[in-house]
Amino acid sequence: MNSDPTLGDEIAALAAQLEAGEYRLITKIGEFDAQGGYAREGALSCAHWLSYRVGLGLGPAREKVRVARLLPK
């Protein structure tokens, strides 16, 4: 079976982009949580807002907020 020799490199590059995007997302979630942005939109918590606005399940949303709160300020 012949495989594209650059396919592995493309996968690695895409994975790096996803991780960088996830870091930016978590950072922004931390800022939004600290500023209480969710409350201005009527949500009970940042996790509830993420669940409603972004479509995450409440469990994964809580995990993102938990991780965001652990990041250095």
Can you name each region flagged by the protein language model?
Residues 1-73:
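Peripheral, non-cofactor segments flanking catalytic/redox cores
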